[in-house]
Amino acid sequence: MPWIQIKINSTGGQAETLSDALMENGAVSVTFQDSHDNPVFEPLPGETLLWGDTDVIGLFDAETEMSAVIAELENHPALGAGFRHKIEQIEDKDWEREWMDNFHPMQFGHRLWICPSWREIPEPDAVNVMLDPGLAFGTGTHPTTALCLQWLDGLDLAGKTVIDFGCGSGILAIAALKLGAARAIGIDIDPQAIQASRDNAERNGVSGRLELYLPKDQPADLSADVVVANILAGPLRELAPLIGCLPRQGGLLGLSGILASQAESVCEAYREKFALDPVAEREEWCRITGVHR
């Protein structure tokens, strides 16, 4: 069955009230989308994350009289007569099947593969992490995750302890364990991420070597041979005093979630304690690595 979609640009502060207005006028679903594709944190449980410039997208049954919906929305205080919007008809698809068909095993570096469970493993003798996309956490498709996976693949992790700061799906911690690390520690602000990491670790047979913590529960004396943090430039700068103390003397640090234009400001926050390598870039994103002095 086809559907009608309306897209309205809004500020983050008005988006939720527009969502309510769309639902009151017959929308079967409403979603929020960043107008500029800016990276953001995962929201805390119970929070709705909104950008400064947000597209509010309502989906209606194909038989909906949209002129009547528009007339009602023009009375909304955030819109008014003649508000800008885009309406289009979209065809119904088996979205789940299409999505599954488009998700393939991916190789990172020389040894490491990330494989969905419904695909045949391309290299059975390689290091294979089985990971199905689920919650909005890393699966390897984003350039920042790919940069971190490639970095881990190039390290000798045998017997090492690795901290994955902002672990999301646990993909980096699990990859480190499969690459030979003796122990991994995942830290995330979101309980859903902790659960996703736990589930993925069990699927990959490494749950006994993965410790998971919310920040409030993590031990005070945490340290590791390798620390990887794939979050965002702002938090990486703000949390530099904390993250910078996690690698042991001579330990390795890998940072990503950083736009290339933000690299220098992040480097500046870590340069005092770390001998930094040249910045690695991929599709306007970058990775910063270094050794704890």
Curated annotation (Swiss-Prot):
Pfam families: PrmA. Its EC number is 2.1.1.-. The keyword Methyltransferase applies. It is an enzyme of class 2 (transferase). Its main location: cytoplasm. Gene3D superfamilies: Vaccinia Virus protein VP39. Keywords: Cytoplasm, Methyltransferase, S-adenosyl-L-methionine, Transferase. One of its GO terms (molecular function) is protein-lysine N-methyltransferase activity. It comes from the Bacteria. It is found in: Cytoplasm. GO terms for biological process: methylation. GO terms for cellular component: cytosol. S-adenosyl-L-methionine binds at T145, G166, D188, N230. The keyword Cytoplasm applies. It catalyses: L-lysyl-[protein] + 3 S-adenosyl-L-methionine = N(6),N(6),N(6)-trimethyl-L-lysyl-[protein] + 3 S-adenosyl-L-homocysteine + 3 H(+). InterPro entries: Ribosomal_L11_MeTrfase_PrmA (IPR050078), Ribosomal_PrmA_MeTrfase (IPR004498), SAM-dependent_MTases_sf (IPR029063). HAMAP family: Methyltr_PrmA (MF_00735). Methylates ribosomal protein L11. Belongs to the methyltransferase superfamily. PrmA family. NCBIfam families: prmA. This is Ribosomal protein L11 methyltransferase.
